[in-house]
Regions:
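Beta-hairpin "wing" of winged helix-turn-helix
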Residues: 67-76, 83
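Short, charged/polar, Gly/Pro-enriched secondary-structure boundary elements
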Residues: 88-92
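Short, Lys/Arg-enriched N-terminal segment that forms or immediately precedes the first helix
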Residues: 1-7
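Alpha-helical residues within the helix-turn-helix
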Residues: 49, 60, 66-67
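A common structural junction motif
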Residues: 99-100
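N-terminal helix-turn-helix DNA-binding core of bacterial DNA-binding proteins
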Residues: 8, 14-54, 80-87
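Residue-level signal for well-ordered alpha-helical positions
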Residues: 95-96
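Histidine-centered divalent metal-coordination motifs
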Residues: 15, 60-61
Length: 100
């Protein structure tokens, strides 16, 4: 984990919202093609619709979260799915307790 990258990724309200939505995706999204959103994740088109932004902006936000290690990706066919990396998020919490 690179704390600076994590905090940069978290410095945007929409990216924070994405992380919140991915915590309990069934509350915020309709399953895409029968995909288990907890196990596999949420498709970029679902995030795009929820953000009410362009797909390129949503993809950029997801990419930033992914590079920071906050989310994982899984490719199934032509779709990429995103879900939270709960282990990294726990590490961030521990880091904050110890370092700040």
């Amino acid at each position: 984990m690179k704390p600076i990258e994590v905090f940069k990724a978290l410095s945007n309200e929409s990216r924070l919202e994405i992380l919140q939505w991915l915590k309990e995706p069934e509350q915020y999204f309709t399953p895409h093609e029968g995909i288990d959103m907890r196990e596999i994740g949420v498709c970029v088109s679902q995030v795009t619709e929820k953000l009410n932004m362009t797909q390129s902006t949503a993809s950029q936000y997801l990419s930033i979260l992914h590079r920071a290690g906050l989310i994982k990706t899984e490719r199934l066919g032509k779709f990429t799915y995103y879900k939270r990396d709960e282990e990294v998020i726990r590490e961030i919490g521990e880091y904050l307790k110890q370092e700040i």
